C-alpha cells in the first residue's frame, strides 16, 4: 500500500506528542529494539495479500501464547550484551585455566567483573531464547514465525551455547567465566546481534498481540479484488476513551461518501477512524471494529491537516490546492485507492470554497477505481 508522510500524520500513526499516536497505543514492547522495530512496522504497510494474511497469522498465534511468553529476556539483559562488545578488556587470555583465570580475577578485577556480569546475563538471554523456540516449535506457525524459529534453533545449537544455557550462573568458576566470556566476545558476536534482532521482532509483534487483546480488536477479512470496497460494523476511533461506533459500506457503485454537518459534529473523527482501520488492516493487524471486510488497496491518501508555509510563502489555500492536485495525479493510475478529505478548501472564502469543491467533487466522482470520503460544512 502506498502512503505518504502527510497521511501518516493526518491519521496520527505517529505524533510529536506520542501519547496522541496510534504507535503509543500499540506499543507494549519491553525492549528498545522492539520499540524501534514496531515503529518500522507501522511506517511500512504491506503490499501483498500473502504478506498481510501471514502477518495476521503471526499476531493471532502470539495472542494465544502471550501469557506463556518467557520473561527472562529483558531490555537490561540485551543492553548488557550489546555494551559488552563496546568495552575494552585488558590482557584477556584466550586459553583460561584454573591458575591464569584466578590471576586475571585478582589483577584485572574490573574486567573480570564485566565478564562475569555479562556471562550471567548471557545465560538468561540464551535460556529465554530457547524457551521461545520450545513454546512455538510444535505450533502451526506462519511462514514468518517458522523462519524465525528455525533460525533461532540454528543459532542456539552451538555446543558452547547449549552448555551456557545449562550453566548455573551463580556458581560459575573463574575459568568458566573467562571461557564463556571469550567465546561470546570473539566467536559469537554476529550471532548474538542476530539473536537480539530476532528478539526485537518478536517483541514488536507480541506488542501488537497484547494491544489487540487489550482493545478488543478483530482481524478483518481482506481479499484481492479489481473493485475496491470497504464494509465495517461497529468501527470506531481507537484513540478515544469513549468512542462512537459507526457502520460503513463503500463499493464501486457507492464509492463517494459525502459528509455534512456542523463543526465539531464528529466528521473528522469518522474519517480518521476509517483511515486508521484501513491502514491497520494493510499492516496485517487487528482493527477497532466488530467486523470489517475490505479489498486490498493500492494506496491511501488524506487531505485533513493542511498547513501554510511561511518560509516558502505558500498560503494555506495554495497548499490545499497542491495537495488535491497531487492526489488526483496519483489516483489517475487506475489502481485502487482510499481517499480521505476533510473540510475541502477551508483556506478560502465560502463562495470560492463552494465553487472549487463542486468542481473537484464532480471530477472525483468519475473515478471508479477509488473510494472517497469527503466532509464539508458547506451545505
Residue ranges and their predicted role:
Residues 86-99, 144-174, 200-258, 262:
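Amphipathic heptad-repeat alpha-helical coiled-coil/stalk segments that mediate oligomerization
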